[in-house]
Every structure is written in C-alpha cells, then in structure tokens.
Amino acid sequence: MHFRRERTRRRRVLDAARGMPARSLDAARAAPARGRELRKAAAQLDIPWARSWLAGLIRENFMRFVLNPLMDYYAARRASGREKLEDVKGPVILVANHASHLDTPVILSALPRKLRKRTVVAAAADYFYKNRVVAWLVSLIFNTVPVERRRGGGMSKNGGHLDVLLDQGWNLLLYPEGTRSRDGMPGPLRRGAAVLAAAHHLTIVPIRVTGTAEAMPPGRFWPRRRRDKPVPGRHRIEVSFGEPITATGDADEVMEYVKTFFQSGSVSPYRSPYRRRATAGSPN
C-alpha cells in the first residue's frame, strides 16, 4: 500500500513537471508562477542521497574501475585546457555542448578529481526521472539533479534547489542547448546558466566536446567502435576547457561567447577533429 501511494505521488509530481496546457488568455500572466511551480516539482524528484559521502565513494570507484575502462575500449580520449581550471575557485558553473549521452561521463572523467567530486549534473526531469529505477541509477552514477527544461520551468534568478546546491558549494554541469544535437551543430543556447551564475556571482567554464556523437549518436544507448577500417577501431574524443568567464554582464552576451567557443574548433564541433585532419591530409 505504501508503494502504491508513493507511485501515485510520483506520478502527480511528474505531471506537474511536464506541465499542463495553460489557457491562452492567462498563459503570459501565469508564466513566472508556473516556472516556480515546475522548479518546485523538479526539486521533489531529486535524490539527495546521491550526494552523500557513501554515494560519492561508490561513484568514484565505478568511474575508475568500470566507466573509464569501458570508455577506453570504445574511444581514445584526450583533454586540453585543464590548466585553466587550476586557479578556479568553486563553486563554478560548467556549460558544455551536447551531442550524445556519452558527453557526461567523458566530461566528468576529464575534470580534476577535486572538482569532479563536488559536481552535480543537471538532467532533464521529463526524461531521466520518469522511471524511479532509472532516476536512482543516473543520480548515483553521475550525481544528477532533476531540472525542468520546458514550459516555463527553466532556470531563473531563483533556481530553487539549484540555488541551494550552489550555496552549499556544489559545482553545476549544464547543457544550455537543453537537448542533444541531431544535425551536428549546436542549437540555440538558453540563458539560464548565465542568469544563475550572475545571481550567485559565479564563474562559468565553457567546455567543448568533440567525437562523442560518432561513438554514441542520438538514438543509441550503447557506444560503438569505428567501422571505417577492416578492423573496428576506437573513436577519437576530445574535451576542451575554455577560459573561465565572469558572468556579471548581459546574459545573452555571455551565452554568445559560449556558443562561439563551441563553434571555434571546426565548422561542425561534434565531428572528431582527428577525422577532419585525416580528411584534410588525404589526396584528392
């Protein structure tokens, strides 16, 4: 009986997180209140135990003995710009381009251990928290926190449970596109990261990831090896850290800088730079 009541409560919370259609005459007027309601609903889906010392110990060992060897089988990973993080004082907001479910473990593994242990990852409440078992798994393995990404539930100066986590000293990894790219180019960036950083006087660290879409494109739930050679090989994945940004100015300007960094690696930032070099160096 207790399980049934809990399941009913979770369903109601998810319904609120997804949002119900508002009447057209009241939609604009109700948007701020609706945003607060959705952020509150997302907070109720949170699993605080995932941030306990025991969960952190499990997570670090899982990263070391399971995730890293698994990623090494499918991809040759490289991180650049880590020296830019040496003088960064937490908490910080990490913003990255998004093309694959592989992005999160790749980014977390590239972070210095001290920074990684205090980093939470914003995850879509309507995607990762619909099923309680999935929610527990992603929260434990990646230290995720639920965020409502639709219909007025985006972040604002009052980000709800995200404000609390930042005040507690947690770093926050965000994907400002709100979803994975389907066409190989970054989509429009939402302003939430810059607004949240300015409200808390925090630094933003832009992160560019290349190669993950080839290893694990949208639609796949497991990585694959390269098949452009007789013997399947590893993909080339690179994580590049940009110059930290002080988000005290215009949010749109800050996010435009971030988008420029995402695009600075190539015409298509989600394609492996190693493959581009090989193509450029091959005879016509």
Model-derived regions, located:
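Short internal beta-strands
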Residues: V120-D126
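Short acidic-hydrophobic, aromatic-tinged amphipathic segments that line or gate anion-handling sites
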Residues: A79-S80, V145-R149, A247
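Short helix-capping segments at alpha-helix termini
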Residues: R113-L115
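A cross-family acyltransferase "interaction/gating" segment
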Residues: K117, V133-S139, W170-N171, R182-E253
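Short gly/ser/thr-rich secondary-structure transition/capping motifs
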Residues: Y73-S80, S156, G187, W222-R224
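Membrane-anchoring hydrophobic helices of lipid-metabolizing enzymes
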Residues: M1-V106, K117-T119, K130-V133, L140-N143, ...
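Residue-level preference for the first positions of well-ordered beta-strands
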Residues: P91-I93, G169-Y175
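TIR-domain catalytic/interaction hotspot
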Residues: S156-V164
